[in-house]
From Swiss-Prot:
Transit peptide boundaries: 1-17
Details of cofactor binding: Binds 1 heme b (iron(II)-protoporphyrin IX) group per subunit.
Record: residues binding heme b: 261
GO cellular component term, pick one: mitochondrial matrix
InterPro entries, sorted: Ccp1-like, Haem_peroxidase, Haem_peroxidase_sf, Peroxidase_I, Peroxidases_AS, Peroxidases_heam-ligand_BS
Family label: Belongs to the peroxidase family. Cytochrome c peroxidase subfamily.
Enzyme Commission number: 1.11.1.5
Self-association state and partner proteins as the record states: Forms a one-to-one complex with cytochrome c.
Protein name: Cytochrome c peroxidase, mitochondrial
Record flagged with keyword Transmembrane: no
Residues of the active site: 138 (proton acceptor), 277 (tryptophan radical intermediate)
Source species of the chain: Cryptococcus neoformans var. neoformans serotype D (strain JEC21 / ATCC MYA-565) (Filobasidiella neoformans)
Main function: Destroys radicals which are normally produced within the cells and which are toxic to biological systems.
Main subcellular location of this protein, as a coarse class: mitochondrion
Length: 377
């Protein structure tokens, strides 16, 4: 379908759009600097084909911005935010098409810097890796395949409404830590930074190599997802399937991703639950599955929410959603596989986690196949 306007209207609209886009370009540049939007690094001698892509992308962004500003009946603030999102998406697409995006070596430097800062004396078990893994997981696990909302693309946990979702309690620790990394590498988007932090957390803690690639853009508060999209630890297997199927995961992937509980612990002042899942909560392994299956468990007698404790030491915990993996025949099949075969767990987790942290990102924003980034060893 084509759209045509009388000459007088086109002329007026053109002047108004030109004035607005000049103003918007100033705002957009400021927002790119302060909100982690992608930058274009100008090559010394760009190829003509790259230039054509760049000009086409800028033209598309301008048309989109003008349309959102004038054609949707939104408030000026909402329209401006939408225009910025259109431009950022166009920039990411142009970068992907032209090879203007920063290379693997630049992102390896960010990875290395994160790795250097993982150890933190006095925090939990001496490492920030578990909470960085949780940040990557929770910032991606809001995806809804039905309408394409949520996921890692807009890093909307930066905004108060999503930051205050009960499932995200305590993640201010991870966000504040990663903000320091962001100050050192202001060109990286928050979505790329947070997911890269999760990859680093797993790999530096003895886990598998996670395929990862850049391309996420930062959004606005209007793109915050509704509360309730992340798993509720007090629920059972039907809830797990509802949450994970909404993102596009099957039973095997549900169990594999649950293996992230190999790391970290719960806190009464965050989730209400208390304790670690394993005896080595800063090491990524298949110990979670072995303990879940082989240890005797009982209900913990305390005033907090219902959770399990191991009968032998009473120092470990499992959540109702963890125990659901044993009670459901389909889930338990994979618990047994992963408890007996760490290599298989690592392989399946790497695939599922890489899929998780790419949810919500349009294919056109990727520049190519995922990379594997080296560990600090």
């Amino acid at each position: 379908m084509s759209f045509r306007a009388p000459n007088l209207i086109r002329s007026a609209a053109g002047r108004r759009a030109s004035q607005t886009l000049n103003l918007r370009s100033q705002v957009i540049r400021r927002r790119f600097a302060t909100e982690g939007g992608p930058e274009i690094t100008k090559p010394s001698s760009p190829r003509s084909s790259n230039t054509r892509y760049l000009l086409a992308g800028v033209g598309i962004a301008a048309v989109g911005a003008a349309y959102y500003f004038y054609g949707t009946g939104r408030t000026a603030h909402d329209s401006a935010n939408k225009a910025d999102t259109v431009v950022r998406g166009a920039v990411a697409t142009v970068e992907a098409k032209t090879g203007l995006r920063r290379g693997k070596d630049e992102y390896q430097k960010v990875y290395n810097r994160i790795a250097e800062t993982l150890e933190k004396e006095g925090y939990d078990d001496g490492s920030l890796a578990p909470v960085l893994l949780r940040l990557a997981w929770h910032s991606s696990g809001t995806y809804n395949k039905e309408d394409g909302t949520g996921g890692s693309n807009f890093a909307t946990m930066r905004f108060k409404p999503e930051a205050e979702h009960s499932a995200n309690n305590g993640l201010h620790v991870a966000r504040e830590h990663m903000e320091k990394i962001k100050q050192e590498f202001p060109w990286i988007s928050y979505g790329d930074l947070w997911t890269l932090g999760g990859v680093c957390a797993v790999q530096e803690s003895g886990g598998p190599t996670i395929p990862w690639r850049p391309g996420r853009i930062d959004g606005f508060e209007a793109q915050v997802t509704p509360d309730g999209r992340l798993p509720d630890a007090s629920q059972a297997q039907d809830h797990l399937r509802f949450i994970f199927n909404r993102m596009g995961f099957n039973d095997q992937e549900i169990v594999a991703l649950s293996g992230a509980h190999a790391m970290g612990r719960c806190h009464t002042n965050r989730s209400g639950f208390e304790g670690p899942w394993t005896f080595s909560p800063v090491t990524f392994s298949n110990q979670y599955f072995a303990l879940l299956r082989d240890e005797p468990w009982q209900w913990k007698k305390w005033t907090g929410p219902a959770q399990y404790e191991d009968k032998n030491t009473k120092t470990l915990m499992m959540l109702p959603t963890d125990m659901a993996l044993l009670k459901d025949k389909s889930f338990k099949k994979y618990v047994d596989i992963y408890a007996d075969n760490e290599e298989k767990f690592f392989s399946d987790f790497a695939k599922a986690f890489s899929k998780l942290i790419e949810l919500g990102v349009p294919e056109r924003q990727w520049a190519g196949e995922p990379w594997t980034l080296g560990t600090s060893d």
